[in-house]
Amino acid sequence: MQIANTLPELIGNTPLLRLERFAPGAGVLAKLESFNPLSSAKDRAGLYMILDAEERGLLQPGAVIVEPTSGNTGVALAYIGRQRGYRVVLTMPETMSQERRSLLAALGAELVLTEGARGMGGAIERAKELLESTPGAWMPDQFNNPANARAHYETTGPELWRDTDGGVDVLVAGVGSGGTITGVGEYLKSKNPNVKIVAVEPAGSPVLSGGKPGPHKVQGIGAGFVPQVLNTSVYDEIIPVENEDAFQTGRRIGSTEGVLVGISSGAAAWAALQLAKRPENEGKTIVALLPVTGDEAYAAARELARTEGVLAGVSSGAAAHAARILAQRPDMRGKTIAVVLPDTGERYLSTGLFA
């Protein structure tokens, strides 16, 4: 029998999808990290960092996990940490989406919001203050924790190599904490030094390219500084992506492939598409690591409540979002689209979904 006893046992072994409708004939594959239990690549890092801390005696029973996070690491730490009996306190910029905050609260995390203009730097400073003032606290410190990158060296990288039969030519990945591109990149280059690793960052905060940090809307990447865990020698090229290109590409993947992805996934896919257009990459296999699912279902549910006065659940939000994508197609102009909203939203009132 294949029965998991705990949710973290289901982390990893996510599928590869050929994006043939999104990029016909381009040889672009998507590593769908949204198939992890809580829908992101951070599930891997969260599990590895907690297990590593337990093994080294840094996490004692009843301890408090404190971490600055832009969202998905917090989701992973919340559900894994709470399941293992820890209190989880997360600091994050106030610019993070209400949907993400609601999800974290629903998982039992305590949120501390910091000034948005200070970016992740402000969240990190606040987390350090809490670490010093909270007895029994431990900080995973994803930006500096080697277990973050090791999670991807030992799992994501081998999966990509196995599933492509060693045929991956180019890896495209966004850079947030740097753990994913470092771990996967180091593993792939250990198998084939000729594999090209491409880093993706927000054009509004091109720190890796030598620019200045700044505000941007590509949640999950672009921390505004160079993380210590990031191996800056592992990537061969950096591609900055504009906010709108990330948004539009994410929507295109949804409408062409039926896969709802987040903004950072849209950024990685956009960069992969630009690489596929280059003559030197003709016939090559390009893998875009899509780290997260979209928050569109949550956002659509909130929008239904605000604009139509309809208290709809998340599954209804997903249906409404899909209908909106259909309505934007030229072939649907003038047509009547009926949407079935299968659930009400009263069960989500306690999570802050409609706050």
Name the predicted role of every residue range:
Residues 1-355:
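PLP-dependent amino-acid enzyme catalytic core
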